[in-house]
Structures are given as structure tokens and as C-alpha cells.
Swiss-Prot record:
Keyword annotations from UniProtKB, A to Z: Ribonucleoprotein, Ribosomal protein
Gene3D superfamilies the UniProt entry points to: Glucose-6-phosphate isomerase like protein, domain 1, Helix hairpin bin
A GO molecular-function descriptor: structural constituent of ribosome
Gene giving rise to this polypeptide: rpsB
Family indicated by similarity: Belongs to the universal ribosomal protein uS2 family.
Native organism: Ligilactobacillus salivarius (strain UCC118) (Lactobacillus salivarius)
Listed name of the protein: Small ribosomal subunit protein uS2
Gene Ontology BP, a term: translation
Pfam families: Ribosomal_S2
Keyword Transit peptide in record: no
GO cellular component, one term: cytosolic small ribosomal subunit
InterPro entries membership: Ribosomal_uS2, Ribosomal_uS2_bac/mit/plastid, Ribosomal_uS2_CS, Ribosomal_uS2_flav_dom_sf
């Protein structure tokens, strides 16, 4: 049974790609058709590739792999943080700092500074310092927390990256490639799939689409850690019903009637 059904993907708007003038020809094999100037992603392929991504992430988690969730665009920030935390993993949901992976030693020094300032706030040190100095420390702490809080407790360089919108996160992609870290990513019709190890053709702009797929990657981690008997059920997952959409022709019918509701541009 598929990890996500075609009906769930349709309800989340996963099938809506970008405008036809904004595409990468390498994504052609993942595109079913074009409607009203919008590319429509072939969800039959997406269903299968989500299964592949799920198994890949699950296998990594079962080997105690560290998974880093990356998504800094507004539509992804909340889901990236919440699902990474739910899976007991790590995340970057604001600006990716250059060298996060390739200069890990320097990043660790910044994380150490963040922890030191937090300790000062908790052990009463702030009470003994001038107000101006405390204000500066708080400002520094908040900035470090914003960019590094999601990887503060990451024990080592991750074994896998899950990325929403690899075009936007191109620096993270390049760093992972340099270190031979496999990438699982949601690739929209304007992305280069050749840069990604495990591809999920998907709308990466719609909040519901991002949430649905990100939550499934978190489920894969939890299942990998716990075993199949404890496979998780998420509240955010769309409900399965008997009236499953199971043909590409049905997709076209839905698209023709619903194309105006797309989030993609």
C-alpha cells in the first residue's frame, strides 16, 4: 500500500507545478500535462517516488542516522521545525549559514557560544551584569538561536538531508554534494532533479503539500527507530477514503475544475 494516496496528494495540491515559462526541461519526465499555463506533475510517479523516499529515510533512521530537515522559505518553516522535532531530528528553517556542513567545526563554536549565553541566563549571571551588556548578550543569543537553534544538539554532520525547494537551498545542496551526503528533496517543475539523490516531484510552494510530505518523512524516521509495529499516525495526514483517485485521467478532471486555486506561480 502506498505511503500517500493520489487522493491525498490532490487534496494538498501536490500536482500543481510552476508556470510553463518557469521550468527546467530535466523535469519533463515527471510532468503529466499543462493546463492554463501551469505544468501538472504526474502524481502516479510521485506516489511511487514518495514510497522510495520513505523507505530511504526509514532505513537511514533504523541505522541511527542523523537526518537534517531544511526549508527556509516561509511556506516550509513551520512544518520543517515541527516535523523535525516530532521525529527527534534537526532542522534549519531560517537562512542557511554558509559552511553549516563544510565548516562544521566553526559552526560548533557558534553553537557553544549559544549554549554559554543560555547558561548565563539560567544560572543568574545576567543578574550580576550591567543592563547594556545583558541586552547585547540577549540580542546575540536570539540571533544564534534563530539560525542555529535547530541544530544546537545535532551530534555530528547529518547522514541525510531532507530539503524543501533545493533551488532555494542551493548552498545546502552544494555542501551536501561536497561531503557526499545523500539528499531527499521535494522537486518542483523548475528544479534540477539531477542534483538530488532521492527525488519527490511535488509542488514545493503550497503549505499543505509541504506539510503532507514533510510529515511523511518524519513518520519514516519514527518507524525506522521504533519498528513497523509502532508505525506512527499523524494528525496532519489527510484521511483515506474509499473514493480514491487512482488514474491520471481523474487528475486532469480535477485540475481543469480547480486550476485557479493553485498556490504556484
Amino acid at each position: 500500500m502506498a505511503v500517500i494516496t493520489m487522493k491525498q496528494l490532490l487534496e494538498a495540491g501536490v500536482h500543481f507545478g510552476h508556470q510553463t515559462r518557469r521550468w527546467n526541461p530535466k523535469m519533463k519526465k515527471y510532468i503529466f500535462t499543462e493546463r492554463n499555463g501551469i505544468y501538472i506533475i504526474d502524481l502516479q510517479k510521485t506516489v511511487k517516488l514518495i514510497d522510495d523516499a520513505y523507505d530511504f529515510i526509514k532505513d537511514a533512521a533504523s541505522d541511527d542516522g542523523v537526518v537534517l530537515f531544511v526549508g527556509t522559505k516561509k511556506q516550509a518553516q513551520e512544518a520543517i521545525e515541527e516535523e523535525a522535532k516530532r521525529a527527534g531530528q534537526y532542522y534549519v528553517n531560517h537562512r542557511w549559514l554558509g559552511g553549516t556542513l563544510t565548516n562544521w567545526n566553526t559552526i560548533q563554536k557558534r553553537i557553544k557560544k549559544l549554549k554559554e549565553i543560555k547558561a548565563m541566563a539560567e544560572d543568574g549571571t545576567f543578574d550580576r551584569l550591567p543592563k547594556k551588556e545583558v541586552a547585547l548578550l540577549i540580542k546575540q543569543r536570539d540571533r544564534l538561536e534563530k539560525f542555529l537553534g535547530g541544530i544546537e544538539d545535532m551530534p555530528r554532520i547529518p547522514d541525510v538531508l531532507f530539503i524543501v525547494d533545493p533551488r532555494k537551498e542551493r548552498i545546502a545542496v552544494k555542501e551536501a554534494q561536497k561531503l557526499n551526503i545523500p539528499i531527499v528533496a521535494m522537486v518542483d517543475t523548475n528544479a534540477d532533479p539531477d542534483e538530488i539523490d532521492v527525488k519527490i516531484p511535488s509542488n514545493d510552494d503550497a503549505i499543505r503539500a509541504v506539510r503532507l510530505i514533510t510529515s511523511k518523512m518524519a513518520d519514516a524516521i519514527i518507524e525506522g527507530r521504533q519498528g513497523e509495529d509502532d508505525a506512527p499516525v499523524t494528525e496532519d495526514t489527510f484521511e483515506n477514503t474509499d473514493d480514491q483517485v487512482d488514474s491520471i485521467e481523474d487528475i486532469v478532471e480535477v485540475v481543469e475544475g480547480d486550476n485557479d486555486s493553485t498556490d504556484a506561480e
